[in-house]
Amino acid sequence: MDAQIENAIQIAWDPQSDPSLKSQAFEFLQQLRADPSAWHICSTLFTKSPRSADVVRLVSLEIVNLAVQVQQLDAASLAFLKDSLLDYVRRTYGPGAQDEPDVPSLQNKLTQTLTYLFARLYKSGWETFLSDFLALTASSEGNPRQRDNVRGVTLYLRILGSVHDEIADNMLARQGNEGKRNAELKDAIRERDMRMVVESWQDLLSQYTGRDDAILEHTLKVMAKWVSWIDISLVITQDMLNLLFPLIGCVNPQGGADMVRDAAIEAFTEIAGKKMKPVDKTELISFLNLRQIISELVASPPLSQFRGTHRYDSDLAESVAKLVNVVVTDVVKVLEDGSVGEESRAKAGQHLQDFLPLLLRLFSDEYDEVCSTVIPSLTDILTFLRKVPELPDSYREMLRPIMDAIVAKMRFDETSHWFEGEEAEEEADFLELRKRLQNLQKSVAAVDENLFIDVMSNLVATTLQNLDERGAQMDWRDIDLALHELLQFGELALPNQGLAAKSQPSSNAAERLNVIMRKLVESSIADFPHPAVLLQYMEVCVRYCVFFETNHSYIPRVLENFVRLVHYDLTRFRVRSWYLFHRFVKQLRAQVGNVAETIIQSIADLLPIKAEVSAEDGSEDDMSSDQTDNSADAIFNSQLYLFEAIGYISSTSATPVDKQALYARSVMEPLFRDMENHLEKAKSGDAQAILQIHHVIMALGTLAHGFGDHAKPGHQRQAPDKLVSAEFARAAEAILIALGQLNSRMDIRAACRSAFSKLLNVLGSAVLPQLPQWIEGLLSQSSSKDEMAMFLRLLDQVVYGFKTEISDVLNLLLTPLLQRVFGGLAEPINGTDDEIQLGELRREYLTFLQIILDNDLGAVLVSETNQGFFESIISSVVTLAKTGGHVNMVASRLAFCTLYRIVGVWGGPDVANISANPSAPTGTPTPAIPGFDQFMIERFHPVCFEVLQDPQFNPSKDAQSKQVLNEIAALEQAIYVKTGNSFISHLQSSLFPALGIDGTEFLRCMTTSTDKKTFGNYLQNLIKNRR
């Protein structure tokens, strides 16, 4: 059998094996893994001599591992495995071993197997596990602490590391009873073998220092693992510390990494971070002399003399930073603990004073990884200081060096070359670090606002002063830093933003900001020859537009700078600058005055559109995609900001209306010609021509948006001036011509739909006669349900905006419009996306009907033109109320709301009332449409109970179903109010007998529930009791 297994493994792992044989071999091995007796043969295959091939032995051990882990071997089987493997280990790794040691992969697998046996047998069955492997380390029984057998030492250390990983690694998720098992094993080790294990570390450190760095490093890494769960007093003896201290301080004479030193620091970090009582922690920090150790490390040549050179040891810096971070974090915990005595608190306070300079040295390290390592502890310090009610001077004095260090770290380092493509990832990492540093600055400001204001304002003022004196000779990094910090300063200076949102805005900060902004605008910073500075300048001006609202005289100068900077010959710069120019103009359009002609002339060279079809994005569905990179699409999307900005600046109150129309015409005429020149090619399917027309349509719409976007939130939309409206009516006509020719293209329809929505405010009622053309073009035979839904949403705006003027147009277009919509509603569903789009179309259709009814346009639905379609509308709403019941609750709720509105519009005067003490119904129903009273009872009422009795309708467990239930209750009551006794008679003759109730409680609840939810709860209980 063993030969068969060996052969199968070799075939399975031989790349040259016949595929059919290989498949059979894998199948055989799969069966072998499930065989409860296979482990016995496999253990022999591993230990036998002469040895089998490495792959055979590796797979054999895997099968043994599986048996120990999963198959729950009995005590005799485990004992056999223990004896056979221990015998093998002694032969291979013990003193005087003749056999060659296993290759590393087999040593790892053997260590894993032995660890699994440890977990099963250490408590009972192999109590001498650790001492058995420790015995392998000594060549002479007479001198057992002379650990001179390197093979045995290496395996012993592997075993210790593996045992920790199995029972004490907190990063691994534990299942079932593993946690309990691991706790018991750790307790057993502490009781039996812990002192022996620690002594073995001491022996190894003592005997291998200066002889074998690999063993030293391995020993230290094992110590670092075990320290977290053993009695720390066993480790921090003077003898052990005397061995550790020289290793921590050892220096590689060539500079660069020293693995032993780094491992020693890691072990020390774990010792320092050991969880213990606050009093003990302060004593431990003192006992370990951590301040002196870290100070010496920081002052050592790798971190001091070699700083700023290629010999600087960043790995050592990061290791020391981890140690400092652990120590400071624990010190802060002691200070935050209210139960700590004064003596311990004083010691902790002194520790904080001692370690802060070391922390700030590492925080300021040129390597951002080192800086990031200590950010958590610096955050802890600032969080603690925020909680101190009356900040002592000793603590307040810490803030200035902290703030200075943060500001210094905010600066681009000397190797940075902003905007160079190969450094994009490095720049992104730094900008992410800046965000973390900003949070630290905010914490400083929260502790001492005046300090924050002084540092920030002095930094900016000094930089601007240096700029005046040195001009272009200044380092761009210094100016960039000042401008970046100025952007952060606004969180204090401006109200309702950032820190100021929690309290009143800082008048001191606001005053400083005003002074700084004056200096900034008056300086020559906009002429500095570096894109980082120029773009930051634009960002600052846009960020503080509120400054220009009260300092109008500075606007022309800044606007002139912006117009110049939007021409900057760097794509990434341009893309951002066009957006910032748009923001600046938009926010200050009431103050810029009549400058449109000058600006249009100045940026005219940026307006020509050059559509580019990229090889990978040439399909029609991708033409409208919004990119965030420097692709042609992304550049065009930014170019649109220029058109919108022209719209804003051309339609200011200071610009005469005839001039507004002239400016609009001057920008649109080239676009019209461009569209006309490309239309024929586009009709023949030319991708570039189609994309060009798409872009022109988008530009026309965006320009219109700038002209029409004047209303502030909450203000009534004003009718546009006829001169301006006439110009944009020409744009609408041009777009409609293109749409009529190209409406089979989804991307063209999308651009036209976008333009239509933006033209509404500048066209005013002039859009109404064009509506049939828009509908014809935008709702083509190839329009998706999603497109129909979006267009209905636009029509909602039109109906609401022109409700007094739209009646005649709506009367003409309603039936053809809804026929298109019904076609979309009837389309079969193919996949999840289709189902989502159908749900959206249903919701928009029902909302559109409600908008018509809510704006007193219901007469259009029953006009002579549309009355033949009225029955179809009602049927569609009733159907959606039913089909939405459990598939689309939102549509169902809207459908019942629509039926409720229909009852209100055509149900006639009330003949009954709902009140706590209702009177009996009086008179007969007189609906607005003859016979509509019976129509409501026979068509609307049944759908209510059809949904209620649907087994999948469960309002007690689903919030959306509950909303539908409430709308059903409201509809039932509305029908009663309009039909009175007719409805009661219907209920008594049909519904109540069907439900098996006398109806008294039903009628009482329906007629007295002034809140529809009360009647809804009754209906819910009624149906629930019948299920």
UniProtKB/Swiss-Prot annotation:
InterPro entries: ARM-like, ARM-type_fold, Exportin-1/Importin-b-like, Exportin-T_C, XPOT
Name of the featured protein: Exportin-T
Cystine residue pairs: none
Database matches in PANTHER family: EXPORTIN-T, EXPORTIN-T/LOS1
Signal peptide range: none
Family, as annotated: Belongs to the exportin family.
One annotated GO molecular function: small GTPase binding
Function (record text): tRNA nucleus export receptor which facilitates tRNA translocation across the nuclear pore complex. Involved in pre-tRNA splicing, probably by affecting the interaction of pre-tRNA with splicing endonuclease.
One GO CC term, this protein: nuclear matrix
Short name of any one Pfam family annotated for the protein: Exportin-T
Key words of the record: Cytoplasm, Nucleus, RNA-binding, Transport, tRNA processing, tRNA-binding
Example GO biological process: tRNA processing
Subcellular location per the Swiss-Prot or TrEMBL entry: Nucleus; Cytoplasm
Organism this protein belongs to: Pyricularia oryzae (strain 70-15 / ATCC MYA-4617 / FGSC 8958)
